[in-house]
Amino acid sequence: MTEQTTTPDGLVIVDKPSGFTSHDVVAKMRGIARTRRVGHAGTLDPMATGVLVLGVQRATKLLGHLALTEKEYLGTIRLGQDTVTDDAEGEITSSTDASGVTRASIDAGVAALTGRIMQVPSKVSAIKIDGKRSYARVRGGEEFEIPARPVTISSFRVYDVREAVAEDGTPVLDLVVSVVCSSGTYIRAIARDLGAGLGVGGHLTALRRTRVGPYGLDAARTLDQHQEELTVMPVAEAAASAFPRWDVDEKRAKLLLNGVRLDMPAHPPGPVAVFGPDGAFLVLVEEEKGKAKSLAVFA
């Protein structure tokens, strides 16, 4: 990471505060970085805190590919109440005594939601249904269904189970959990589905994103800290840390920059960062039929 006093060119890792939308953070960063060319890789709900990866200037071209990486969360799930939003921001729609739910049944429910699963996203979300945001359809009183889609929950752990009493007097259980998952996973939906499977309902009461791909809380700074001293990860460093690396000689570098599809060495599926003989980050590519297909040029 380097500290900048002029308009930066790279990634900015923010520890998002509760109450801010991801767009709020982008708007704030536009002022701090003195440029409108700012975007983010993966939305965080207003209630949630934690790692939000921003791209500034040329680094915005990395964001769509960074958004596809694995994410890690810490959160609290309340068993015994459903809400319209599947989190604590929404109105409670049902309450059920959860005091009889056992740890064994919780563990079984967690196991059923681990691995490759089909998940229905929360209705109050930014997902588009026939071109219209799902939350806008909910606000308009529309009746609709969101199709399930595949997601991967690599890890779902319960660290603590706490007995509590909700404001309406319902005995509930609060679970302190961690989740490692693929892009596009809704943690709110995990809370909802765990509660539904246990027959008592459930929603998310707290969420903190601790990692996006290789970028964790140790690399994140608050908006106030960035306002005081903006810290930027250069594009080349960001690419090298997030994607497999392919070093090429000068001849191959020129061919790749001109869009020639060269044979690629074996790499895991997904984007690969190409570096020239001088160590400069040149282009992001992916394998297609054994050849390098250009995704974004940075040279």
Curated annotation (Swiss-Prot):
InterPro entries, per the entry: PsdUridine_synth_cat_dom_sf, PsdUridine_synth_N, PUA-like_sf, PUA_sf, tRNA_psdUridine_synth_fam2_C, tRNA_psdUridine_synth_TruB, TruB_C
Catalytic activity: uridine(55) in tRNA = pseudouridine(55) in tRNA
Molecular functions per Gene Ontology: RNA binding; tRNA pseudouridine(55) synthase activity
Active site location: 45
EC number: 5.4.99.25
Keywords: Isomerase, tRNA processing
GO biological process: mRNA pseudouridine synthesis; tRNA pseudouridine synthesis
Top-level lineage group: Bacteria
Signal peptide range: none
NCBIfam families with a match to the protein in the record: TruB (TIGR00431)
HAMAP family: TruB_bact (MF_01080)
General function of this protein: Responsible for synthesis of pseudouridine from uracil-55 in the psi GC loop of transfer RNAs.
PANTHER family in UniProt: PSEUDOURIDYLATE SYNTHASE TRUB1, TRNA-PSEUDOURIDINE SYNTHASE
Protein name (record): tRNA pseudouridine synthase B
Native source species: Streptomyces griseus subsp. griseus (strain JCM 4626 / CBS 651.72 / NBRC 13350 / KCC S-0626 / ISP 5235)
